Amino acid sequence: MPRITRRRTISAPVPEVWGLVSDPYNLPRWWPRTSRVENVDSKGGGRRAEWTKLLETAEGRGVRADFRCVSSAEPERYVWEQELEGTPFERHLRRYGIEVALDDEDGGTRVSIAAQQTLRGLSRLGSPMMRRGQGALLDEALDGIERALT
């Protein structure tokens, strides 16, 4: 699946935005439908950190999903992927990753969030719908960053 990217300039400085987006415990403050984060294991800083997100479904149920940071370059880029093997998500997804990139822009921060989702099997037929859904999710995430820092 192609990469979906959304960008926005946030009025907060890069170090503040970095502090928010690079700490998994902050995800409920800005990432859509995340009610809480558990089991954060920060192995040597941000890179290789692992955590469990409790996601709220539209029906109000909680769904657990495990993630790990695969790349971190302070204060420029934070990348995480969902651990899919052995989970119900594995039936539909081959890969799911998020990259947050930060650039200084006139005292504020240019935030780019990209999602890359590779669908598996018959789920690939829903690709256009998934692209729209991911775009909306990334817009909500940018709204969340703005709310959390302004």
Task: For the regions a language model picked out, list residue spans one by one.
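Hydrophobic ligand-binding cavity/cleft-lining segments
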Residues: 1-47
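Hydrophobic/aromatic beta-strand elements that line small-molecule binding cavities or substrate pockets
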Residues: 6-8, 64-71, 94-104
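Beta-strand/loop substructures that line and gate deep hydrophobic ligand-binding cavities in soluble
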Residues: 84-140
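Hydrophobic pocket/interface hotspot
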Residues: 16-21, 27, 51, 69, ...
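Preference for bulky hydrophobic residues occupying beta-strand positions
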Residues: 8, 53, 80-82, 100, ...
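Short, intrinsically disordered, mixed-charge
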Residues: 19-33, 131, 135, 139, ...
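Short solvent-exposed loop/turn micro-motifs enriched in small/polar/acidic residues
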Residues: 1, 60-62, 93-95
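Glycine-rich portal/gate segments that line the openings of hydrophobic small-molecule binding cavities
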Residues: 38-88, 105, 140-150
